[in-house]
Curated annotation (Swiss-Prot):
The record marks 64-65, 230-231 as: Cleavage. One of its GO terms (biological process) is hemoglobin biosynthetic process. SMART domains: TGFB (SM00204). Glycans are attached at residues 48, 144, 266. The keyword Methyltransferase does not apply. GO terms for cellular component: extracellular space. Proteolytic processing yields a number of bioactive forms, consisting either solely of the mature alpha chain, of the most N-terminal propeptide linked through a disulfide bond to the mature alpha chain, or of the entire proprotein. This is Inhibin alpha chain. Residues 45-82 are annotated as: Disordered.
């Protein structure tokens, strides 16, 4: 029996430290907010102050896009669109020391890219290949008597195929190759092999001269069948402010919350004072464990039997059970933050924040 008590006591200490439980019969909203603040700050750290005096994100983004001719309403709608920018570095490149002289004179460089599963699952809206040419001006020497100076090929099952590109403005010693829309599907491959031909370009041996791909993506719109599956069923009751208040505060009946249960609280980041830092989601449902356990007898388990979330864990003699989250059932909260007022965003995760199952532990 003694070898079994030690891991159970350690489990109890872990739950009392990290779980959301062991609260009194009445739980104040400010106490829950303070707990959420501590968990978020412990995971993300304190927010960075905006360099422009903390101007509202919506106003700054609207002003930034005003010169494009779009309406303010359209700019506000674009803020909620799931956009991302990915930079891909090659996993393998040409070995400049071992490069054959014939290929080096031809200026043919081979690079292998491995787009992530996240990138392949999204819709590419723009893509550029940045390549270090070592030349001051590439745009003036794009065409010569023998044809284009920089060409791009992609390996396929049928052999190399030409990739349509457009040479755009670039800093000195670099070339920016904008891929045409038909070439966006290349980034949906798990393995992408590009062959770049630049006869007058030296082999980029230095690390800061490594080429890279820049992909702008957005969430792929769901198909008709997916939209039908994802469409939530209408609630059996009409939504009203009274229903929202039920989520924001516990029931007035103490008996309904006397036993151990999973409670819910609607928390907005504006209420926490972080709406200029955490911009998405604007609010979330915080689940936590609440209620008493009473005098719950320890269950007698047969060898190999598993506990269910509704069963109390066996404790040592004299131990008092606590209503807390079941270990390994906490879920993270994914948020999008900004530290410069909306000019750039960062996707972050607050781990072990949302309770899934409660039990008397």
């Amino acid at each position: 029996m003694l070898p079994l008590l030690l891991p159970l006591q350690l489990l109890l200490l872990m739950v009392m430290k990290g779980g959301h439980g062991c609260q009194g019969p009445e739980l104040d909203r400010e106490l829950v907010l303070a707990k959420v603040r501590a968990l978020v700050l412990d995971a993300l750290g304190p927010p960075n102050a905006s360099k422009d005096g903390g101007k509202p994100v919506a106003q700054r983004l609207t002003r930034r896009h005003a010169h494009t001719g779009g309406s303010t309403r359209r700019s506000m709608e674009n803020e909620d669109e799931d956009l991302s920018q990915v930079i891909l570095f090659p996993t393998t490149g040409p070995g400049c020391e071992d490069e054959p002289e014939a290929r080096a004179a031809e200026g043919l460089f081979t690079y292998t890219f491995r787009p992530s599963l996240h990138t392949r699952s999204r819709q590419v809206t723009a893509a550029q290949l940045w390549f270090h040419t070592g030349l001051d001006k590439v745009g003036a020497e794009v065409h010569n008597d023998s044809g284009p100076m920089v060409t791009l090929l992609a390996m396929s099952s049928g052999g190399p195929m030409a990739v349509p590109i457009l040479l755009g403005p670039a800093p000195p010693h670099w070339a920016v190759l904008h891929l045409a829309a038909p070439a966006f599907t290349l980034l949906t491959r798990p393995l992408l092999v590009l062959l770049l031909r630049c006869p007058n370009c030296p082999c980029p041996a230095q690390l800061d001269a490594t080429p890279f791909l820049v992909a702008h993506t957005r969430a792929r719109p769901p198909s008709v069948g997916e939209r039908a599956r994802r469409s939530p069923l209408p609630p059996p009751w009409p939504w009203s402010p009274a229903a929202l208040r039920l989520l924001q505060r516990p029931s007035e009946d103490p008996a309904a919350h006397a036993d151990c249960h999973r409670a819910a609280l609607n928390i907005s980041f504006q209420e926490l004072g972080w709406d200029q830092w955490i911009v998405h989601p604007p609010s979330f449902i915080f689940h936590y464990c609440h209620g008493g356990c009473g005098l719950v007898p320890s269950p007698v388990l047969s060898p190999g039997a598993a506990l269910t979330p509704s069963q109390p864990l066996p404790l040592g003699p004299g131990s008092r059970p606590c209503c807390a989250a079941m270990p390994s059932t906490m879920r993270p909260l994914r948020v999008r933050t900004t530290s410069d007022g909306g000019y750039s965003f960062k996707y972050e995760i607050v781990p072990n924040l949302l309770t899934q199952h409660c039990a008397c532990i």
